[in-house]
Amino acid sequence: MKRKVMPSITTEKAERQFIQFRVSLWNNEHEIKLNFPQEWKLIECRMAGHDFPSLSDLQIHEAFEKPIGTPRIRDIARGKKKVVILFDDLARPTPAYKIIPFVLRELGEAGIEPDRIKLVCAYGCHRPLVRQEMIKKLGKEIVENYLVFNHNVYEHHVKLGTTSRGTPVLINREVAGCDLKIGVGCIIPHFTTGYGGGAKIMVPGAAAMETIAYNHIEIEKAYPEHVGLGKVKNNPRRVDLEEAAKIAGLDLVVNVVVNHRKEILGLFVGDFVEQHRKGVAFANKVYGTENRGKFDLMVLNAFPIEESPEKALWPAEESLKRGGDVVLIWQTTDGILPHYLVGTFGSDYGGRKWQRPGTLRIPNAKNLFIYAEDFSKLEKRWWGPEDRVFLYRNWEKLIDTLWPVHGKGTRVAVYPYATLQCPIFPDGY
């Protein structure tokens, strides 16, 4: 009889050990069940908030009734002529289709008609969305009844000023022309600004390449020790983009903290700094994942940020024994996200922050094994040297390859949604 796999507990005396993995965000999202040798000492490392309850519609409504640091949306909106709602793209798990109807209801209470409301996909340096993707993100009713635009990182901007650190603030022309600017996004771990969310929906979301590049490259270069995963307090990149968002006139942000099923665990409405910090404090309690020591082998699921799968590798840097191996579960049909700042666009060149491929993306690992249905030669090169990156479509063959090296007693960590997880950070980090 199969035994249930409990979180962070070694499973013994089972014919096979099974763990469920969620895969393919936004594209036929589903769960797959993978098996592991019973002889392995398997530990599933779940985030602290794995079983936190999701918010009801009433609780979501209450968050809109009591914003943080600002009046209600309906009160801010009274007398405004043009409204823009910024939303993030499919590289983020924000259930905008769930949140934006509450925003529209507030605007309706202020007497704002639909033809005075526009929505802009604030994807920064990512790619635009096609209609079906907009429907996935926003819902069919919104796409059919409101004007929805993609941002353009290279054209149609208005220069509104310069931050004290020298970042030129060039903002999407459609956004700049509105007298009420509302952002909708999510607060999830981020490798340079500490956490996503807050002002990031405006910068980089709706900013020009000149703005984004300066904030990403020059600010980061000047203060490298102050940026990083989970670092929000006094983070120069975040402080700079918050100043830029203020110059751009961002009025209010709605941020969610979600679980691995895109269910809303926390919702924070209001001033893009104040609500963000409260959201980060809650996100730390949700996404923080206990360090269970050192491991011979680590299995990391790239879900839900599968288009940026390198974000799943942080547990290996923290807990993999030197010379150990990493298995990446990467079940997405879209592959690596096209990114105009860091992406590859030729045989030996790319965006302004592009790095030449070469060393393995996990310095302390011996090999990287990727479980993927589809992949390209370019993606394989992106991960590192060909003799250290191995791609498998068949899970059983992958396990058979690992077994001669990782036999009985191998200590194995499994992170079921690694791109959503992060270390446990102290308060005010």
Pin down the residues of each PLM region.
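C-terminal non-catalytic interaction/assembly regions of soluble proteins
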Residues: 9-11, 108, 314-429
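Short glycine-rich or small-residue beta-strand-to-loop segments that form or flank ligand, phosphate
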Residues: 82-93, 118-124, 298-301
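Histidine-anchored nucleotide/phosphate-binding helix
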Residues: 92-112, 312-320, 326
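An acidic, phosphate/nucleotide-engaging active-site surface
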Residues: 129-196
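Membrane-embedded hairpin module used as a gating/binding unit in multi-pass transport
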Residues: 224-305
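Long, well-ordered mid-to-C-terminal structural blocks that present hydrophobic/aromatic surfaces
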Residues: 277-343
